[in-house]
Amino acid sequence: KVGFLAPTLQTEFMIGIDEKLHEECDNRGWDYVSASFDNDSAAAVSAIENMVTGNCNYIVAMVSDTSCDDALRAAQEKGVKIIECGVETAVHDLVLKTDQYSIGTQIGDMAADWLNSQLGGEGNIVVYTTYQNQDMQDRGQGIQDAIKEKAPNVNILEVVDIGKDVVGSGTTTTETMLQKYSNLNGIVCYGDAAAVESVEAVKAAGKDNENFGVFACDGTNQALKGINDGTCMRGTMYFEALGSVVAKYIQELVDGKTFDAAIETPIHAVTKANIADYYKADK
């Protein structure tokens, strides 16, 4: 039995992982349960304990820090295999991770390339990040550093903490930014959920034109559709289907394989130039 512990199950990215992992487990005849801790460490600990009492053999934990280590260690001591996804702490049997700062620089590189080609290396942007966990803070810093390096004449007008997976924050923040900065040319977000909301706010303000760009990360279907349809959504980082990737490695654990080193999960930059490789209109 597999348990999936997610920071939220309200965003398209996390819902997609949950649904795909559930499907993969069903295909293998494994029982499956998922829970969201809504970025609350106490809720995460409770969910882990419930998965142990619910006879989970494997827990896929997308924790954001070390606050769950004791609960994960207690689960491990009862024979549960721990798969950490995204963040590496001291307690795990397998880690699937990404270099969050590197992801940030890749998002920033996409934005800088567009700013250089479309606006001659000039322009005014805002960056949406969050300081609620170290990973997203690192990603946000990578965004800023890459833009400063590759498009040094672009003005980063403001770096905004929009919270972690807060539904609606992209909309309200973008409405504020558009009112505050009439000369805004772009928004660079740590994740697609806020970016997709931002695109809609930009459209509503009548600024969805060739000189406005939104960039983010996750490769959600909504973000890919925005790129494909020619909106101001210009680029996203695409994670290969994480549900399938996780299931593949759980199968290897089932088969007795052990892992000494973390596994880097594959990720790809997607823009208008290669959108056809990642998005099909009938999805």
Task: Locate predicted features.
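A residue-level marker of the well-folded mature domains of exported/periplasmic proteins
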Residues: 1-283
